[in-house]
A protein has these predicted regions:
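Conserved active-site tyrosine of GNAT-family acetyltransferases
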Residues: 1, 144, 149
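Short hydrophobic/aromatic beta-strand or adjacent loop that forms the aromatic wall/cage
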Residues: 1-4, 63-65, 163-167
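Conserved N-terminal entry element of GNAT/NAT acetyltransferase domains
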Residues: 2-28, 170, 174
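Acetyl-CoA-dependent GNAT
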Residues: 6, 20, 24-109, 115-120, ...
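Residue-level detector of beta-propeller blades
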Residues: 83, 151-154
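Conserved beta-strand-loop-alpha-helix junction that forms the acyl-donor binding cleft
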Residues: 106, 131-141, 157-162
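Conserved GNAT acetyl-CoA-binding A-motif
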Residues: 118, 124-136
């Protein structure tokens, strides 16, 4: 996925001077998270359909939805308020969590927020965590492997006949 290439190992908050608080989203955050979802993926609009506000509201109540809150008040970032990044995971029928998205505001990329969100999400997981990734996206596959994910299987035609995916799984708590 070209849309995941920004998920590169990045400097820490200490190195960049950017600090965020990672916390569980509240119902007051969902419109800002939905706005972030729309602006976080501009490089592949023909391949990516943002989730609507209605599902973000449901995920505030029913899923693990973490936000990276940037200091500076509610209007420090265009469109997403003080939310610099977000992660959403939801339970599957197989007693795992599906890591659906990690996204970082374009103004905040490269500051370690994606790493902070991934670490916080995995720390909260009480079961294995799975995700899907384009098998040709070597940078993302390597990044996920660095976080402890392993390839479970490859599924050709996962979304459309030409859109293949690797299912990668993190073992969860040890």
């Amino acid at each position: 996925d070209r849309i995941l290439l920004w998920l590169q190992p990045s400097p820490s908050a200490e190195e960049t001077g950017v600090s965020c608080t990672i916390e569980t989203a509240s119902d007051r955050d969902y419109l800002h998270v939905a706005a972030l979802d729309r602006i976080a993926w501009p490089i592949a609009p023909d391949l990516f359909i943002p989730d609507g506000e209605h599902i973000w509201r449901i995920w505030c109540d029913m899923a693990t939805l973490l936000v990276a809150r940037r200091p500076g008040g509610s209007d420090s970032l265009s469109e997403s308020g003080d939310i610099a990044g977000a992660l959403v995971m939801f339970p599957t029928n197989a007693s795992e969590l599906c890591l659906h998205k990690i996204m970082v505001h374009p103004e905040c990329r490269g500051s370690g927020i994606g790493t902070q969100l991934m670490q916080a999400g995995l720390a909260q997981a009480n079961t294995p965590v799975l995700l899907t990734v384009d098998p040709s996206n070597n940078a993302a596959v390597a990044l996920y492997q660095n976080f402890g994910f392993d390839v479970r299987e490859r599924i050709d035609g996962y979304y459309r006949p030409h859109e293949h995916r690797l299912i990668m799984v993190h073992p969860g708590p040890s």
